[in-house]
Amino acid sequence: MAATVNLELDPIFLKALGFLHSKSKDSAEKLKTLLDESLARGIDASYRPAQKDVEPPKISSTKSLSIKQEPKTSSSLPSGSSNGKVLAAEKLKKEAEKRPADKMKDATEGVDVPKKPRLEKPETRSSPITVQTSKDLAMADLSSFEETSADDFAMEMGLACVVCRQMTVASGNQLVECQECHNLYHQDCHKPQVTDKEVNDPRLVWYCARCTRQMKRMAQKTQKPPQKPAPTVVSVAPTVKDPLVKKPETKLKQETTFLAFKRTEVKPSTVISGNSSSNNVSSSVTSGLTGWAAFAAKTSSAGPSTAKLNSTAQNSSGKPAASSASQKPVGLTGLATSSKGGIGSKIGSSNSTSPSVPLKPLPPLTLGKTGLSRSVSCDNVSKVGLPSPSSLVPGGSSQLSGNGNSATAGPTGSITSKTTSETSSSTSASLKGPTSQESQLNAMKRLQMVKKKAAQKKLKK
């Protein structure tokens, strides 16, 4: 077993062990020199693989082992006492075992090569020339590396010109930094040459040609996108939204017209129940349904403020006062004149909404309804501007001068004279105290609330 172990060991390793365990003062230095020599040999062998004279040390290793077994055994006795030395020896063993493995590979390749004497091999390997060549190679590599690394470092740090890769600076050829990409350019290297004014002006922010192009493209792109979606928003959105927006408006208009007709039917019942609303309305009465629709819409849209005006307009004696021309009230004579159609009239009226009547043959209806309004008119107060029959001229237009309100009477003068005479006779009986004004206001408020609720319900539907 000892023989097999000895065959695997390297003579250099045995030398190193001898130096390690020796008590001489020079042993450390000798060990160091041996290490340097072995390293030099390893480098030399890697550079010159043609010299395949590795087998002689393999043969001579058996001889050297037999010679050096005695000092090894003698030196191994004191090694047991020092643990630190053993640890160091193990390290050296590991290093040395790696080297012989490489040498064994070379030995298998170079068996046929002619053998050289053992003494020449360590001399050639440990020659100082090989050490010098390795140093020269290392120095050359370092110098080239330093040169390249300096250039690369300058480029990485952005200290050199991007075009010519140099850091030289002259008076008219200074390095200028782009504020966008932070690359350095010589004034001459940059394609549109940079002027001294641009370099020396501290207020100027300089951009290279590439960055200026990119910034222009970006600016154009940012300008274009809002223009492109803008027409789509304008064209698409209204097409979707317009029918939705416009349809409810048209519906609302239709509903208001229909509501107007419905309100005309509702109002006579409110008049009969005593909840009369005082409304002053300006109307150009025409023949047919359109006149009635316009009349009813305007009566329904009049506010309670007109009622207050009419109620305050009467005198303390109970005589009705003249209504202002701007209010242009409509009264019972309007119903009579509207039956014949074609004569627009501005007429004095009572405050009651009795003229709003279901659509039927008008002249007989007006007579019947005037009687109805006369019977119910006890609840109504402050009838303003009722015309008197005394100044009525049949067939011609005349002023009903009872209270200064003008009324144009058509060919049906006899009917209007009858209705006005009946209503004027009823005014004296219908005038009451101020408490009825409050009831009128309350009735107005109720009516408006009812109208609003009805309109809201129809809108929801």
UniProtKB/Swiss-Prot annotation:
Cross-link (Glycyl lysine isopeptide (Lys-Gly) (interchain with G-Cter in SUMO2)): 68, 253
Gene Ontology MF: a single term: zinc ion binding
Biased composition annotated in UniProt, kind: Polar residues: 300-327
InterPro entries xrefs: Int12_PHD, Integrator_subunit_12, Zinc_finger_PHD-type_CS, Znf_FYVE_PHD, Znf_PHD, Znf_PHD-finger, Znf_RING/FYVE/PHD
In-chain residues carrying the UniProt-annotated modification Phosphoserine: 127
Function comment: Component of the integrator complex, a multiprotein complex that terminates RNA polymerase II (Pol II) transcription in the promoter-proximal region of genes.
Gene3D superfamilies (alphabetical): Zinc/RING finger domain, C3HC4 (zinc finger)
Species name: Rattus norvegicus (Rat)
Family, similarity comment: Belongs to the Integrator subunit 12 family.
Protein name (database record): Integrator complex subunit 12
